[in-house]
C-alpha cells in the first residue's frame, strides 16, 4: 500500500506546485473564475476559540504585575542580553499583544524560544494555535504565513489546528492562492490532515475553480479514501460543486453517491444541479414535485432550494412547454411553503454550521438537578 501511495504523493505535490507557482511544471497562470461570494468562516467557533482567547487576554492583563510596557521592555532586554526565554513568558507575551509592533516583538521571542527548545518538543506546549488566534484577532495573516513557511521554525507549528486557522483566515479574505501555499507547507511538514483540513482544502480548490485545483481536489480525495478516511459531508459538497463547475458531471455524481445522509440544503441543491447538467429533466421535475407536495408534518424539516438554483432549472426547461408549466406550478408551491432561500449556492456551501460541542455542553450542564445537585437520573428516581 505504501508503495502504491508514493506516486500519488509526487503527483499531488507537482499539482500543488503547478497551481501556486505557474512557471513550475505548469501550463500558465491560474485565475480565480469563481466569484468570491460569501466570505464566511469555514471553521466553527469551537475550533478558532477567538472569544476564549480574548477573555484570557483580559484576565492575564489584569493579573500582570506592572505595566505592559515594562513587560515588553524586560523581554527586549532578555533578547539583547541573550538570556533564556521561559515558556510562561512567551505565553503571557502572546496574550498581551495588541498591535503589529507587539507582534513583531513576539516573532523575535518565538525565534529565540524555538532555537532554545526545538530539541525538546515532545509533550511541549503548543504555541502555534495561540499565535494564530492572535493574528486572527489583529488581521495579521501575512505575519502568520511568514512564520509558518520559515524553515528556521520547523516544528514550532506542528499541529493541524495552527494550519487550519491560518487557512481559514486566508479563505475569509479571498486569498485562496496563499491558502493553498499554506496547505502545501502543511503537507511538506507532514502535519496530519484532519476533517477540518479537508473541508478547507476542498473549499480552497472550489474557489480557485480551475482544472489544476480540480486535479488537486481529486487526488486529495482519492488518497483519503485509500487511507480509509471518511470525508465529511461538507468537504464532499465542495468537491461536488467544483466538479460541476468544471463540467465533470460523472465525477460529481460519483462523489455525491458516497455522501452519507445527503439531506443538507447544500446536498439538496447540488443534486438539482447534477440533474440539470445530466439533462435528466423529467427526474428533475419529479424531485422538485416530491419536495413541494410531500405530506410532511410541520415539525418535519422540508428541503429548501436556492433561488439561484431554481432559476437554472427554469432556464433548462424553458423550451419544453409541459415541463416549464409544471415547474412554474411547483415553483409557486415552494414559495408558499417557505422552501426557497435567496442565498446563493456559494453562500450555502460556505455557511458555517453551529458547534455541536456547545450544544453538548448545555446538555451536560443539565445532567445534574439544580435543586439537589445530584445526577438527574438519581434525582428523578428519588422523587
Curated annotation (Swiss-Prot):
Coiled coil: none annotated. GO terms for molecular function: RNA binding. The modification Phosphoserine is found at residue 377. It is found in: Mitochondrion. InterPro entries: mS27/PTCD2 (IPR034913), Pentatricopeptide_rpt (IPR002885), PTCD2 (IPR034629), TPR-like_helical_dom_sf (IPR011990). PROSITE patterns: PPR. One of its GO terms (biological process) is regulation of mRNA processing. Signal peptide: none annotated. Belongs to the PTCD2 family. This is Pentatricopeptide repeat-containing protein 2, mitochondrial. It comes from Pongo abelii. The gene is PTCD2.
